[in-house]
């Protein structure tokens, strides 16, 4: 130990100190953001002299590394750290995350909420999913190519200041969707053994879901990919059982085809929900490919992710729409829906007068599928928090992951009892930012950078070299006005959205993206001209 005035330093032999797993020595010192210098002893041996703050932070990294948890945060992943060359890992990540009850329930909105028949619902599901998922696959390529997390990459794409705003929105979105997903699964678990007096309380259901999420997200990238590679299997099996029981019930009918302005409005509103779900992973995308080597074929990454996203989204949502059509044709199933939404329909299909005990077991498995959907939320929330503000990057990723899970648990329990409807409406509103983000990011890459060589990785945290974000922030604000005018929700219908059909139609995504695109491409050339970045 070395004392100098009121400062306390610890001296460590350079040759005896090895980098922490998932974090280089250089990055570890940079994160500490404290006084660090080298010293030379009388025998010419060099030492690193660090303040006690840096030493304490180093201890945290070493502790988490000893548990085999990923300690690397938002700093760029170097080429020698890129050891994940599995295309299957990239594809299965999103395959499992979407083979879940949340996407199944979303597909049911077509018939249940928007009054579309089965055929119309299927067409909307396919078209709007494709529109959304291609951006997730596209930005996943950036992770392997540049080694940057999505919110750090955003500093280049939307501007440094604007990226911080999107990071904040992303933190809210990660926790918010975790709350909504957890509440749905907790309600389904609560239905198991209904009437026996031995049911799973709502709070316990939330604790089970969050506990499972913590076990995986704590360890980081490698364990997440290992879990997601296989977690789709039991979920897929249960969905096959639902198909079998739905077919045996004979309650499914396709419904009549109806046209007109009101139907058009319903198509747009349902499509808006579908697009938001499929594109929802866009602001997470690069986080799950950063450890893939730069030499990995970009087309393989893109098309494998398109397939890994498309199949589970099409499959679960179409099945959800079919289940909803059946529920509309049966008063008992409809009563289950009115009481417990699509969780109630799942229970009605699998348990009473059906598979009984085995059906309840299937309900438990499907409720646990939410863990696979929550994992990306709780991993990315940590990286988004670190990207928000430099001092927050000092806090290890593992700590942020635990904090995100704790916040999700703390809010999901009262939300399930008292304001789950409010949470769903709130998250629907948050989702509109995706279209604005996509419009700005694609403009920057295709019009102004045009190739990966235009991204200087060394500038990832350099305020002097990164785009300021004047154009990006202006586009975000104007795009938000477009969203407000075009959205059609139960709590708000915009002046333009209300003009479509009897009940209005949601074109918030379309207006938000188009207005942001126009403003950004007017202001970005001026920003480059006067600021040079």
Swiss-Prot record:
GO BP field: cytidine transport; cytosine transport; purine-containing compound transmembrane transport
Record topology, Cytoplasmic segments: 1-98, 142-198, 277-300, 368-398, 486-533
Main location, first listed in the record: membrane
Ribosomal protein among keywords: no
Extracellular-side segments: 120-121, 219-256, 321-347, 419-465
GO cellular component: cell periphery; fungal-type vacuole membrane; plasma membrane
Cross-link (Glycyl lysine isopeptide (Lys-Gly) (interchain with G-Cter in ubiquitin)): 16
Modification note: Not N-glycosylated.
Keyword set, alphabetical order: Isopeptide bond, Membrane, Phosphoprotein, Transmembrane, Transmembrane helix, Transport, Ubl conjugation
Protein's cellular compartments: Membrane
Residue numbers bearing the Phosphoserine modification: 18
Membrane topology (UniProt): Multi-pass membrane protein
GO molecular function: cytidine transmembrane transporter activity; nucleobase transmembrane transporter activity
Top-level taxon in the UniProt lineage: Eukaryota
Transmembrane segment boundaries: 99-119, 122-141, 199-218, 257-276, 301-320, 348-367, 399-418, 466-485
Alphabetical list of Pfam families matching this protein: Transp_cyt_pur (PF02133)
Stretches the record annotates as Surface seeking: 165-184
Primary role: This permease has a broad specificity towards purines, and also transport cytosine and 5-methylcytosine but neither uracil nor thymine.
Note: Present with 23600 molecules/cell in log phase SD medium.
Family: Belongs to the purine-cytosine permease (2.A.39) family.
Name of the molecule in the record: Purine-cytosine permease FCY2
């Amino acid at each position: 130990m070395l004392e100098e005035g009121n400062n306390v330093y610890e001296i460590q032999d350079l040759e005896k100190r090895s980098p922490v797993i998932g974090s280089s020595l250089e990055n570890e010192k940079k994160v500490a953001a404290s006084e660090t210098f080298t010293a030379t002893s009388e025998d010419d041996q060099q030492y690193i002299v660090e303040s006690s703050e840096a030493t304490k932070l180093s201890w945290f990294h070493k502790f988490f590394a000893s548990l085999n948890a990923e300690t690397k945060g938002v700093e760029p992943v170097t080429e020698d750290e890129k050891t994940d060359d599995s295309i299957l890992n990239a594809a299965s990540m999103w395959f499992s995350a979407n083979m879940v009850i949340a996407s199944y329930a979303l597909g049911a909105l077509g018939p249940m909420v928007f009054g579309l028949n089965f055929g119309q619902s299927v067409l909307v599901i396919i078209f709007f999913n494709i529109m959304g998922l291609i951006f997730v696959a596209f930005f996943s390529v950036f992770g392997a190519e540049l080694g940057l997390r999505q919110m750090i990459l955003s500093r280049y794409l939307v501007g440094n200041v604007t990226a911080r705003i999107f990071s904040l929105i992303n933190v809210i979105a990660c926790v918010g969707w975790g709350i909504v997903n957890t509440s749905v699964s907790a309600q389904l678990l609560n239905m198991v053994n209904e009437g026996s007096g031995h049911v799973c309380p709502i709070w316990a259901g939330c604790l089970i879901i969050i506990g499972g999420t913590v076990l995986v997200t704590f360890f980081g990238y490698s364990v997440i990919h290992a879990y997601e590679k296989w977690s789709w299997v039991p979920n897929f099996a249960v969905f096959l059982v639902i198909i079998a029981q739905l077919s045996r019930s004979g309650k499914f009918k396709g419904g009549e085809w109806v046209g007109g302005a009101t139907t058009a409005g319903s198509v747009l509103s349902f499509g808006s929900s579908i697009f938001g779900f499929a594109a929802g992973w866009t602001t997470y995308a690069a986080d799950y490919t950063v450890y893939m080597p730069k030499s990995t074929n970009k087309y393989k990454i893109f098309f494998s992710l398109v397939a890994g996203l498309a199949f589970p989204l099409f499959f679960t949502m179409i099945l959800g729409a079919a289940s909803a059509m059946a529920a509309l044709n049966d008063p008992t199933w409809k009563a289950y829906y009115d009481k417990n939404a699509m969780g109630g329909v799942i229970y009605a299909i699998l348990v009473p007068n059906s598979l009984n005990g085995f059906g309840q077991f299937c309900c438990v498995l499907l409720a646990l599928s939410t863990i696979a959907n929550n994992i990306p939320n709780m991993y990315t929330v940590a990286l988004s928090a670190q990207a928000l503000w430099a001092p927050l990057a000092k806090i290890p990723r593992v700590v942020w992951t635990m904090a995100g899970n704790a916040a999700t648990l703390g809010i999901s329990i009262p939300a399930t009892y008292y304001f789950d409807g409010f949470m769903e409406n709130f998250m629907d509103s948050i989702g509109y930012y995706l279209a604005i983000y996509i419009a700005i990011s694609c403009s920057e890459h295709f019009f102004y950078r045009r190739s990966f060589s235009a991204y200087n990785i060394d500038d990832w945290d350099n305020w002097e070299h990164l785009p300021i974000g004047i154009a990006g922030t202006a586009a975000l604000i104007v795009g938000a006005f477009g969203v407000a005018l075009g959205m059609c929700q139960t709590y708000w219908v915009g002046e333009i959205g209300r003009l479509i059909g009897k009940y209005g139609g949601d074109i918030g995504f379309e207006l938000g993206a188009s207005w942001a695109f126009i403003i950004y491409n007017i202001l970005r050339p001026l920003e480059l001209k006067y600021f040079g970045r």
